[in-house]
Regions:
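Residue-level signature of catalytic and energy-coupling elements of molecular machines
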Residues: 7-8, 44, 59, 106, ...
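Hydrophobic alpha-helical transmembrane segments
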Residues: 1-16
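Predominantly long cytosolic amphipathic alpha-helical stalk/bundle segments
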Residues: 21-108, 112-126, 156-207
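Pore-lining and gate-forming transmembrane alpha-helices of multi-pass membrane transport proteins
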Residues: 1, 130-161
């Protein structure tokens, strides 16, 4: 019963925490790319982004090292991603342990019940067959209870792991898009001054 309550609490907590809108807020990636293009990457924007969601934390990590070589930025993204996965995996190890240990504990209870029943037979004889069958049934209830707890726990454990893996892929895509946007903005900024200088020289020549 205790394992069942614990498993239910973990499942409900993870369902609430791993909601898509909480991990990957809609439109956040595009909004941050617009910041990058417009040069609105001040410390307050980045700090609020970092605290907003796991996706925001990943994009903020990329912005912390903007202007550095792409390999360094990607390394920072991967490092931050590992920390975020660890945070999203919170309590899942416990849920997986419950899924694995539930049937074993149920089987243990069944074995103990069977041993007690056979020891009773040794002391008092077989007695009533119906009573013997009832004792066996009560012992098997332990195994059934363990499986009732383990099967949903295993299903939800796999579900959460799959959801987290999907989130990680999407966050990496958003981070890559941000890198591309920053590099495009950098290239555009580098291309503008020569053009401006050429226009100035042309205007001076006309004068």
């Amino acid at each position: 019963v205790l394992l069942g309550v614990l498993a239910l609490a973990i499942i409900l907590e993870r369902l609430w925490t791993l909601r898509r809108n909480e991990v990957l807020p809609p439109g956040l990636g595009q909004e941050v790319r617009n910041w990058a293009v417009r040069g609105r990457l001040d410390a307050s924007h980045i700090q609020s982004l970092r605290a907003s969601s796991p996706l925001g934390a990943l994009l903020a990590a990329a912005l912390d090292v903007r202007g550095k070589p792409r390999d360094l930025v990607r390394e920072r993204i991967e490092d931050t991603g590992r920390h975020l996965v660890h945070r999203m995996d919170r309590h899942l190890n416990a849920l997986g342990t419950i899924a694995s240990a539930g049937p074993l504990l149920g089987l243990f209870g069944t074995v103990v019940g069977m041993i007690q029943m056979f020891l009773g037979i040794l002391d008092h004889g077989v007695g009533d067959v119906n009573q013997l069958a009832g004792g066996i049934g009560k012992a098997l209830v332990c195994t059934a209870a363990g499986m009732v707890i383990a099967v949903p726990s295993l299903i939800m454990y796999r579900y959460f792991r799959g959801r987290i893996a999907g989130y990680v892929v999407e966050m990496e895509q958003e981070a890559t898009a941000l890198l591309d946007a920053m590099e495009s903005g950098k290239a555009g900024a580098a291309a503008r001054p020569p053009s401006a200088a050429a226009d100035a020289r042309l205007a001076k020549g006309r004068a």
